[in-house]
Amino acid sequence: MKLAVVGSINIDQTVIADRIPHKGETLPGHGLSYIPGGKGANQAVAMARLGADVAMFGCVGDDDNGRKMVENLIANGVKADQVRTVKGVPTGIAIITIGDNDNTIIVVAGANSKVDRAYVDSVKEDLLGYDMVVLQHEIPLDTVHYIVDLCSEHNIPVVLNPAPAAAVPAEIIEKVTWLTPNEHEAVLIFGEDKTAEELLRMYPGKLLITQGSRGVSVGLSSEEILTVPVRPAKVVDTTGAGDTLNGAFCYRIAMGDSVEDALRYANTAASLSTEKFSAQGGMPTAEEVEKALKEL
């Protein structure tokens, strides 16, 4: 099975502190690092680490950061032939603060904003040859919706991780195979008048909601909800845990796993990813996930 990720490619500027600063507060940091990131690239790397045949579609700037990010994708086993280098704009950057088992993230889109309809049309023939397409919200939303429409027209399964949080039109929800928000994104998409449980019963086999320390839930039917609790972990850095879960879930679903098996696998992979520093640095291999599953 061939998987395609169309999404963001960033460099993450990461600062470590004792805790996340309050509004208007200045805190000393313990370290500064520049590491590969972007929700799209992260999810592609998560899949590749687990053994997936995955390609990245997106844009980087004509700068050192862009070249390094493409080299990193290739080094991790992600195909990058369709990653476009764009002159005159910087590679996307995420500014991350890590502290007290939590993080904050501010993203500057840069070249990710150039993943537009013209770019998609230029790679469409190749893109439509994949068995599953995975999307996020760090590229222009009209591009995301355009790709969902294309995949729907060609009967290609498409997974939308709607992060950062933004509204998702009802017709897009109907067309995606899976929608994977966290609990905060779910409120923005569906409103506050329905609980997560009610939403999961409304969209069985389509909606997956991550709920932080309470685990991850999915509706198996309108009558049955599966919640997989968080695996205990010695947390070092939660950055990228959601991307690891999404990447692992997509890979295992594409490989034919049941929803329950895919979710347990993905939840375990996400937990393992928090035990090392950086979004991609902690992403586990298939062997590591299988070992952890046996120990549960």
Predicted features along the sequence, with ranges:
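Glycine-rich phosphate/adenosyl-contacting loop at the front of the ribokinase-like
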Residues: 1-59, 64-71, 75, 279-280
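Conserved phosphate-binding/catalytic loop of the ribokinase/pfkB sugar-kinase fold
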Residues: 85-86, 96-132, 137
